[in-house]
Amino acid sequence: MNVNQTMADNQQRCELKLIASPGSWRLYSARKIDERFKSYEQKIFQRDRYTCQFCGFQARLYQDIVNLDGDYTNNRLSNLVTACCFCAQCFFVESVGVGGYGGGTLIYLPELTQAELNSLCHVLFCAITNDTGYKSSAQNIYRSFKFRSQIVEEKFGEGTSDPAIFGQLMIDSGVNSEEIREKLFKNIRLLPSRAKFRKQIEKWAASALEEIAD
């Protein structure tokens, strides 16, 4: 088999999109706490080397498993991939920030793909948390991203930079055409919340410092 082709297929397969769909979150969260899924989950983490298949972030902690086709009844190994918590929440836009799950803001950012933004946020949050020489620059970049939420609200209305509100509006309006969904989400990205992921960020940052010290 052509290795380059396999890699190209994999990259294409793991393109990160924002998705809002009724029912998926319920099945996903039920599976997450199902003890029977734990050993299956470990198989996937090991296969993917604990690496997010969307943004490339590698960590032993707080990685999730998502279904590539968005069907949470299709739990074949080939349909399941490792996703960091920033990328995983993109599959459940309507549930972001609801009941303690995830957190973030919808922003207008045509310059970066969603996966690129998530990857950059891992770097920014680590720089801020570990109080590196780049802390102030990282804070400024993150702040400038957050400011982009105003463009979303100007276009779609007050409150629509809240992913749960935007996602629920999409579900309620019955948008199930891929073409319309892509148009609505065009150039819109989900900016992960530093405050909501504080626990995860602090653990990752501590691990990064340990690796440097080793």
Curated annotation (Swiss-Prot):
InterPro entries associated with the record: HNH_nuc, T4SS_Dot/Icm_subcomplex
Cysteines joined through disulfide linkages: none
Subcellular localization: Cytoplasm
GO molecular function, one term: metal ion binding
Source organism (scientific name): Legionella pneumophila subsp. pneumophila (strain Philadelphia 1 / ATCC 33152 / DSM 7513)
Key words, A-Z: Cytoplasm, Metal-binding, Protein transport, Transport, Virulence, Zinc
One GO BP: protein transport
Assembly, per entry: The T4BSS is a complex nanomachine composed of several subcomplexes. This subunit is part of the Type IV Coupling Complex (T4CC), a subcomplex composed of the DotLMNYZ core and the IcmSW-LvgA adapter subunits, linked by the C-terminal tail of DotL. Six DotLMNYZ hetero-pentameric units may assemble into a hexameric nanomachine, forming an inner membrane channel for effectors to pass through. Interacts directly with DotL. Interacts with DotZ.
Residues at which Zn(2+) binds: 52, 55, 84, 87
Keyword Protein transport attributed: yes
Protein task: Component of the Dot/Icm type IVB secretion system (T4BSS), which is used to inject bacterial effector proteins into eukaryotic host cells. Part of a subcomplex which recruits effector proteins and delivers them to the core transmembrane subcomplex.
Gene Ontology CC: cytoplasm
Source organism, top-level taxon: Bacteria
Gene behind this protein: dotN
Location, primary (coarse class): cytoplasm
Name of the protein this chain belongs to: Type 4 apparatus protein DotN
